[in-house]
Amino acid sequence: MMKFLTRMLSAFAVLFFAISTAQADDEVRIVIDEGVDGARPIAVVPFKTNGSVPADIAEIVTADLRNSGKFNPIPVSQMPQQPASASEVTPDAWAALGVDAIVVGQVTATGNGYNIAYQLVDTVGASGGAGAVLAQNSVTVGAKWIRYGAHTVSDEVFEKLTAIKGAFRTRIAYVVQKNGGSKPYEIRVADYDGFNQFIVNRSSQPIMSPAWSPDGKRLAYVSFENRKSQLVVQDLGSGARKVVASFQGHNGAPAFSPDGSRLAFASNKEGQLNIYVMGANGGQPTQLTSGSGNNTEPSWSPDGSSILFTSDRGGSPQVYRMSSSGGAASPVGGRGSAQISSDGKTLVMINGNNNVVKQDVTSGASEVLSTSFLGESPSLSPNGIMIIYSSTQGLGKVLQLVSADGRFKARLPGTDGQVKFPAWSPYLDKN
């Protein structure tokens, strides 16, 4: 595990910090709008520290578990004790509060970083005797990776208790339109919770619709540099940018195929706005849609066999589904911006009231997850547990986070401009 984590941190350093781009001054941070009272109670006890630590590990893990909507961490003030290891836990004291699992741990300063050790403890004996250790691990990270270390704990605890892979070591890309300046448009990347934000590219002209490659190493986006819409693919490690589509008219809404070899996009290069597919590095595109109406916002199925897209061919915008090689399309519902979960079971999209909804692929049953004003661009976490989207608040755009079960809702407001077009990264830890 330690060798693996060291390799991953080295890869992250190359991928995200060797871009030679500016660190953003103002980060988006989660502001809770609605809690998770109906979720499973859990306790994350403050970690015992040895020396000064640049971040509160327990606080980060608590926030991660809460943000998933699956857990309702109890506040420190309600904890009957604050053990640092499993041997110090009094199971009955926690079971009396309805808490069947707790996280305890220690953080120790080392010569070149911090060692984070945790134990997940069963307080009711569901997996054996009360007080049994369900999971434990320790990781050593440098100071700037302290939050990554905490998210590692969150991922492991989450997966142990839910059998779903955690996605707290992922990132989000988004566009910020700043208030003034010669280059007010920026693409930024941050941890999923808004921390460790940095600028990928800035421009005097609009930037739109960032999309991640499946390996997390590239972003495709729309740039209006040179006074025309172009599709750009940028390597996040080197910062190298390549214009892959600059056809006459509009070129927009890029989406990488699941294997990363192709890009689907929308273009009106032949007059009508249609869906096209081409190689991820550019090349001659293949037109997939035709007929009346405008077609845009392509999104691939997890296996790459089909594409969801938005079309007004029926008179008003609606989501359709077709083969990734083109052909007949069937209506799905909603109004647009559809994305399918990685297991292929759930669709997330915008409905006619501009709310974020999820829809069961098999039954067609749907549920409204957000009622915020003018919801746009929903993007699923790679495990399908959380959704980030943009909405209008006052005169500007902010990012919103909602758990896929609708229990937890929060905002990630920007402090230096409008924030829009969020895109959740794939898994970046590769475990």
Curated annotation (Swiss-Prot):
<keyword id="KW-0732">Signal</keyword>
<dbReference type="GO" id="GO:0042597">
    <property type="term" value="C:periplasmic space"/>
</dbReference>
<keyword id="KW-0132">Cell division</keyword>
<comment type="subunit">
    <text>The Tol-Pal system is composed of five core proteins: the inner membrane proteins TolA, TolQ and TolR, the periplasmic protein TolB and the outer membrane protein Pal. They form a network linking the inner and outer membranes and the peptidoglycan layer.</text>
</comment>
<comment type="similarity">
    <text>Belongs to the TolB family.</text>
</comment>
<dbReference type="Pfam" id="PF07676">
    <property type="entry name" value="PD40"/>
</dbReference>
<feature type="region of interest" description="Disordered">
    <location>
        <begin position="318"/>
        <end position="340"/>
    </location>
</feature>
<dbReference type="GO" id="GO:0017038">
    <property type="term" value="P:protein import"/>
</dbReference>
<dbReference type="InterPro" id="IPR011042">
    <property type="entry name" value="6-blade_b-propeller_TolB-like"/>
</dbReference>
<dbReference type="Pfam" id="PF04052">
    <property type="entry name" value="TolB_N"/>
</dbReference>
<dbReference type="InterPro" id="IPR011659">
    <property type="entry name" value="PD40"/>
</dbReference>
<keyword id="KW-0131">Cell cycle</keyword>
<dbReference type="GO" id="GO:0051301">
    <property type="term" value="P:cell division"/>
</dbReference>
<protein>
    <recommendedName>
        <fullName>Tol-Pal system protein TolB</fullName>
    </recommendedName>
</protein>
<dbReference type="InterPro" id="IPR014167">
    <property type="entry name" value="Tol-Pal_TolB"/>
</dbReference>
<keyword id="KW-0574">Periplasm</keyword>
<dbReference type="InterPro" id="IPR007195">
    <property type="entry name" value="TolB_N"/>
</dbReference>
<comment type="function">
    <text>Part of the Tol-Pal system, which plays a role in outer membrane invagination during cell division and is important for maintaining outer membrane integrity.</text>
</comment>
<feature type="signal peptide">
    <location>
        <begin position="1"/>
        <end position="24"/>
    </location>
</feature>
<feature type="compositionally biased region" description="Low complexity">
    <location>
        <begin position="323"/>
        <end position="332"/>
    </location>
</feature>
